[in-house]
Amino acid sequence: MKESILYEKLKKGLVKCKTCSHFCVIAPEKRGICGVRENIEGKLFFLPYGQAIAANIDPIEKKPLYHFLPKTFTFSIATVGCNFRCGNCQNWTISQFSKFPDTTRKMIEKSGENLSPKKIIELAQKNNCPSISYTYTEPTIFLEYAFDTMKLAKKAG
């Protein structure tokens, strides 16, 4: 769990999430539309920080990019949660998991594999992946996790 970087504190313990275009106003002990940002005592937290629900090595051609590092592999990661509700989502079991009625904060915090940004860089390098893809769910939702990973990836080259 990590405090969100894009939110505003409002009156009466409410917070306004500014991570995506839904701009959820979230009451204490409630979550936004993504299901992974929760108001805890007047602060907004991203619950599954450091918990990759998916971590795979994919051919870059699988991604919606044109002629980007052709014939290479990318290290792909995602967390649970999504601000979309696409009717034919192929990853609905991970994107919508946090919205199931009986999903608790602890379940979200412990979902997936404990994978720090540093470990992601190490695994990408070990597997000769010159890129990291933030994918499978809407990556804006895991902004803090992705951003911390990006900063380390840039330093690592």
Predicted feature residues:
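Short clusters of hydrophobic/aromatic residues that line enzyme substrate/ligand-binding pockets
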Residues: Y7, C34, F45
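Short, ordered beta-strand-loop transition motifs
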Residues: K9-K12, P28, P70
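Local cysteine-cluster metal-coordination motifs and their immediate loop/turn environment
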Residues: V15-R37, V80-W92
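Short secondary-structure capping/turn segments at boundaries of alpha-helices and beta-strands
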Residues: L6, S21-F23, K62-L65
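Conserved Radical SAM active-site core
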Residues: N39-G157
